[in-house]
Structures are given as structure tokens and as C-alpha cells.
Regions:
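Conserved glycine-rich FAD pyrophosphate-binding loop
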Residues: 1-140
Length: 140
């Protein structure tokens, strides 16, 4: 069987071209490590004066079972996430951060941003009932 996954970000206009290339190249390279070729394509789905969202879609074989499929997806996600951060995109986009993107949050927000997020979590969720650990790990 095949998997189809979309990885998305947003960036300002001067970065869009390099971002498209970086996401597609990272995805191809990650799946090549598993001996897999991928069909990938990118479109700009939300366009604004300041920049655009960048959606890259990857179609690839899931491999010989669940473990192989998960390993391929994790490689793809890690490579594309690293490329997003390296090229100045946002890992949050319109879907939020959550567990899948939390590892890149500090790289995007910096120490001050992470302190602000931690303060908001403490203020608005003092009892730790709202998705504890999703953004800040053990610090929540």
C-alpha cells in the first residue's frame, strides 16, 4: 500500500522558493534512506501580503508492515521538520504544535518565547489538565 502525508509551514515571501526546495529535498532524502522513492509536490494554499503557507505532499510505499510504515513516516517528519526550522518557517502553521511538532518549538520561539508559553500554561492550566506535557514536556 501507499501513504499520503502533507507537511506544511508558512514563511515570508523571500523564503518561499528555498522552502519549497528544502521540504521536497528533505522528504526525498529521508525516504531514500529506507530505499523508497517518493512522489512529492508542493502548493501555496494560503497567500498573504507578508508570505504564504507552503504545503508539500508526499506519496510513498508504506513498506512491509506497520513498523516499516511508522519508521518511514518518522524519518519523513523529522527531516521535513528540521528543514522547516532551518529555512525560517513556522512549525505551528494553522494546526498548532502538539506532540508531533513540540521538538521544534524552542528552535522557533527561543528562550523568551518558551518562558512566555510556560507562564501561560501555569496561569491558564494550574492543575495540569489540558494536554499535559504536549508542548513543554516535563516542564508542564
Amino acid at each position: 500500500g501507499y501513504a499520503v502525508d502533507t507537511m506544511e509551514t508558512a514563511c515570508d515571501w523571500p523564503r518561499v522558493g528555498a522552502m519549497v526546495d528544502a521540504l521536497e529535498d528533505a522528504g526525498r532524502a529521508a525516504l531514500a534512506l529506507h530505499g523508497e522513492r517518493t512522489h512529492c509536490y508542493t502548493h501555496l494554499s494560503h497567500v498573504y501580503a507578508q508570505g504564504s503557507s507552503v504545503y508539500s505532499t508526499f506519496v510513498y510505499s508504506i513498506g512491509p508492515g506497520y513498523d516499516a510504515a511508522l519508521a518511514r513516516w518518522r524519518s519523513l517528519k523529522a527531516a521535513v521538520g528540521d528543514a522547516i526550522v532551518a529555512h525560517g518557517g513556522t512549525i505551528t502553521h494553522q494546526h498548532g504544535v502538539g506532540k508531533d511538532h513540540a521538538r521544534w518549538l524552542a528552535a522557533e520561539k527561543g528562550a523568551t518565547g518558551m518562558s512566555a508559553i510556560a507562564a501561560m500554561v501555569r496561569e491558564f492550566d494550574p492543575h495540569g489538565v489540558m494536554a499535559r506535557g504536549n508542548l513543554l514536556g516535563d516542564a508542564e
